[in-house]
């Protein structure tokens, strides 16, 4: 519905983009059937290596629609690429006297998204709210994918200079946001793609800070999304936070995890409970003895049989056994079940699995 293509086309990623491009009234060109350039590696988004530790009073700030913003700011597009244009900073030059196809289509999708978000707020039933939420998310995803098609080496609109220009200008935008915070006395502890985590004493001070940053970096806009009373930084894309303020308002603590094992569905509930309790304890500022006591209690419950099935993992057979190059983990449990229980799991079957004292995996229903 959004891009006016049939349902079979939607999963193909680049085809919906083609549909949007050819609907643009100002675009009079053609979409090549095959890419015109050989694949070239280019630098992607920046991810700062954090210093592991526990931090307090951490503000999470995002650059609003960063790729879209930089496409518009520098007029990055296939249709504006010109030796006589303005250098975006990495040597690629773009004509500033006419609007580019990429920016126009991104603008169209953003206008649509704002319409859907307004309809979602006006909705009076859960069904309507879900419908408009799905539509606004679809437009957001479509805008993000429009950058991606320029870097897809199998697509007719592939152009390494376009993709590299977008990622270069976006990295520079993130670096500038980082410098703005550091120079104003708010240390940045982590940064990823379009967001930074910096130490700010209070949400109120964070609001004042982001207002000054937006004045300095206009037309690029930064949003103050969350404020964490405490945060654990472990590594790139691996962190946990105790969020107590979101989008302008205080609320009860919410524990937010990114890239940590307890998010994996296959992990045993008991292991998730242990990790969740440990992380919450650290975020809440509890003493190590208190956290150790909690974990000792879990271990004792496991040894006495109180945890039951929460000690078990979930497994799924992804392909026939003969197609696995090596048999290990949960798949080894499937082999054990076949040999000892005469249980023959089929592709996509799910099962419970456990590990014996000797490292042997067992699978059963």
What are these regions (language model features)?
Residues 84-93, 97-98, 105:
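Conserved phosphoryl-transfer catalytic core
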Residues 100-155:
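Active-site cores of enzymes that catalyze phosphoryl transfer or operate on phosphate-rich substrates
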Residues 149-168:
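Gly-rich Lys/Arg/Thr-decorated short loops/hinges at beta-loop-alpha junctions or inter-strand turns
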Residues 89, 164-165, 235-236:
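Charge-rich, low-complexity amphipathic helices
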Residues 41-45, 88-90, 119, 150-155, ...:
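Short amphipathic alpha-helical segments, especially helix-boundary/capping motifs
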């Amino acid at each position: 519905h959004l891009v006016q293509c049939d349902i079979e086309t939607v999963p193909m990623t680049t085809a919906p983009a083609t549909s949007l491009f050819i609907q643009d009234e100002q675009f009079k060109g053609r979409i090549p059937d095959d890419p015109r350039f050989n694949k070239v590696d280019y630098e992607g988004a920046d991810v700062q290596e954090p210093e592991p530790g526990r931090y307090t009073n951490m503000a999470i700030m995002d650059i609003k629609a960063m790729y879209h913003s930089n496409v518009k700011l520098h007029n990055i597009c296939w249709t504006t690429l010109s030796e006589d244009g303005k250098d975006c900073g990495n040597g690629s030059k773009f004509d500033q006297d006419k609007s580019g196809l990429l920016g126009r289509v991104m603008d169209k999708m953003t206008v649509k998204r704002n319409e859907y978000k307004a309809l979602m707020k006006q909705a009076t039933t859960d069904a309507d709210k879900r419908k408009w939420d799905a539509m606004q998310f679809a437009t957001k995803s479509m805008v993000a994918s429009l950058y991606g098609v320029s870097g897809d080496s199998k697509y007719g609109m592939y152009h390494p200079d376009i993709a590299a220009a977008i990622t270069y200008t976006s990295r520079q935008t993130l670096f500038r946001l980082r410098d703005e915070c550091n120079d104003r006395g708010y240390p940045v502890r982590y940064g990823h793609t379009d967001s930074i985590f910096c130490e700010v004493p209070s949400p109120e001070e964070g609001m004042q800070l982001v207002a000054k940053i937006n004045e300095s970096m206009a037309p690029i806009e930064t949003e103050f999304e969350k404020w964490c009373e405490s945060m654990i930084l472990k590594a790139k894309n691996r962190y946990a936070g105790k969020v107590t303020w979101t989008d302008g308002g205080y609320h009860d603590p919410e524990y937010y995890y990114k890239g940590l094992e307890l998010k994996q569905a296959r992990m045993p509930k008991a292991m998730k409970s242990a990790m969740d309790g440990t992380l919450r304890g650290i975020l809440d500022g509890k003493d190590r003895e208190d956290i150790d006591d909690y974990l000792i209690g879990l271990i004792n419950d496991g040894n006495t049989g109180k945890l039951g099935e929460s000690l078990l993992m979930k497994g799924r057979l992804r392909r026939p056994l003969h197609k696995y190059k090596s048999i290990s983990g949960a798949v080894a449990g499937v082999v054990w079940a076949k040999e000892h229980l005469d249980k023959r799991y089929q592709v996509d079957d799910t099962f419970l699995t456990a590990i014996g004292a000797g490292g042997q995996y067992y699978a059963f229903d």
